[in-house]
């Protein structure tokens, strides 16, 4: 694991590397009965889950408290917490089996200032103030902006880890939310020594904390992104 991380320009101190390895062992042990990830092959798990999650921390200063919306089995939140232990983190995931796994991982790894939110994140039910939102290829940008609007305030950052084909939804978000949000970053990048292209998209909240629109209550399909190439 260390070699793959180093090749990808990810350097972790020995205690953090040990925690990430223990998390990997737990993920592997619990995957079959908890439906945590479709990735099985070791290098794919390291690159597409751990490197993909940790690399964003090299590109942006992570806001705190930070909510990871649709975290699934803990991506990107748990690797980010391991690599950047000072952040306060909320792992938002509605599927009970995955929430059980997340709570076990938090306890077994001794992660502090981390908690789970085991319901759908919608604007009227998730109102805990946060300085940042992060989400990894869960849903269109507009839906995340809507359903986290009850928790973000002026200056809060909403960080999207996307694939390269995000232009249409990005244009829609900029057009529809110009009063409440400003696009402050749109950065294409690739995971080092791979063909995996990514886009880092960041919006900043312009208006005080309040529900932007009732349509935030619409159903969306929270999912993880282990099949992203």
Q: PLM ranges: what are they?
A:
Residues 73-86:
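Conserved SAM-binding loop of SAM-dependent methyltransferases across substrates and taxa
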Residues 41-44, 50-51, 83, 126, ...:
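Short capping/connector residues at structural and topological boundaries
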Residues 87-229:
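S-adenosylmethionine
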Residues 1-67, 97-114, 219-225, 229:
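Class I SAM-dependent transferase core
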